[in-house]
């Protein structure tokens, strides 16, 4: 297999529903020879041939359920045209496996751990096509355990590895916002969204913090709660992010300690090839990866058993978490691919515990990805 030389990044992340269903069904229509002269997502039977679908009744039902409420004609047409443009390249590559596009299936709203393809090829040695529209699902939404990080159940991972520094950071953040609220009694403060607010009642000497949960409490009660995250604490996280440039020194001791702890642990864990392969979503079968940056062919996991971690660099924190840059390569290559690994508050700082997200894969040709178009 010849790997082409190119320098591009593959970025993923964000909300997925509308973009996901429009892009996936549009690609399915393009490769299944659908009649698009009068496509109606509420009546897909009239456009998509039943004999091209592995489970036609179930697929039609899923399209009506998932695409209809999210249908965007312009977005759908964009991806349909992209599918048509890449159809020949897909068939040319399938010919290497003595295959061609035949019957297909659709994952629907399910994320399949054992299959990277959103649109699957029935009876083929190639799994299908993984479609990643802008705002689509990340390469891997992982638990911290996937990086070798093992916090106690229910604990914030930053708290687990640096308890004193974590509590000190949150205490400073909480104190600043509480003082700001006290200076403006009765005034609702919403640093980010009006869904997450704080207001001080001067007569009761208490604060009301509103989020997905609400509390009314005095200053000591609030400050004594810094060890655990909670939905009502989102307003403090929003305030810190809004004031990151001025207040980032509050996080320096925490992030300095975490960087040392995480870098060693993650690097040791990722030296295991299976951890790398799972993170990069290599699968038992090869598959196509289609995004706004082009069409790629991703080899099977058996073809990248020699993939190795060359190093792990610590990135610059952005106020929501930690960034690490993994450098990956094949043994016969001096050039490396780079992968950004975020341990971050993706669902609201201090509202929920951090998650691990893998994003921005740069120079994927150095780990076996082949660019086709």
Where are these regions (language model features)?
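Short acidic, low-complexity intrinsically disordered linear motifs used
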Residues: 1-10
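Short, positively charged
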Residues: 9-117, 121-373
């Amino acid at each position: 297999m010849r790997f082409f030389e190119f320098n591009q990044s593959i970025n993923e992340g964000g909300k997925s529903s509308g973009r996901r269903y429009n892009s996936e069904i549009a690609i399915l229509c393009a490769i299944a020879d659908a009649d698009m002269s009068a496509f109606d997502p509420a009546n897909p039977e009239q456009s998509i041939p039943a004999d091209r679908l592995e489970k036609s009744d179930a697929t039609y039902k899923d399209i009506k359920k998932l695409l209809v409420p999210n249908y965007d004609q312009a977005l759908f047409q964009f991806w349909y045209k992209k599918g048509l443009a890449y159809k020949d390249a897909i068939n040319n590559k399938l010919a290497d496996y003595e295959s061609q596009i035949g019957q297909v299936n659709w994952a629907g709203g399910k994320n399949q751990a054992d299959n990277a393809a959103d649109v699957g090829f029935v009876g083929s040695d190639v799994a299908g096509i993984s479609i990643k529209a802008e705002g689509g699902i990340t390469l891997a939404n992982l638990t911290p355990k996937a990086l070798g990080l093992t916090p106690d159940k229910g604990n914030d991972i930053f708290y687990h590895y640096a308890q004193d520094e974590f509590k000190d950071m949150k205490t400073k953040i909480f104190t600043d916002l509480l003082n700001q609220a006290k200076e403006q009694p009765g005034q609702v403060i919403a640093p980010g969204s009006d869904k997450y607010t704080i207001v001080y009642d001067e007569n009761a000497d208490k604060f009301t913090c509103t989020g997905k949960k609400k509390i009314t409490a005095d200053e000591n009660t609030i400050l004594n709660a810094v060890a655990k995250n909670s939905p009502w604490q989102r307003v403090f996280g929003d305030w810190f992010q809004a004031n990151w440039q001025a207040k980032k020194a509050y996080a320096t001791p925490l992030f300095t300690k975490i960087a040392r702890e995480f870098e060693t642990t993650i690097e040791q864990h990722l030296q295991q090839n299976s951890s790398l392969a799972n993170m990069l979503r290599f699968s038992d079968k090869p598959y196509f990866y289609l995004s706004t940056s082009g069409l790629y062919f991703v080899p099977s996991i058996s073809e990248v058993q020699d993939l190795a971690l060359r190093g792990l660099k610590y990135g610059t924190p952005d106020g929501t978490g930690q960034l690490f840059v993994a450098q990956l390569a094949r043994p016969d290559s001096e050039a490396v691919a780079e992968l950004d690994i975020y341990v971050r508050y993706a669902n609201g700082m201090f509202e929920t515990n951090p998650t691990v997200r893998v994003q921005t894969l740069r120079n994927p040709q150095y780990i076996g990805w082949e660019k086709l178009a």
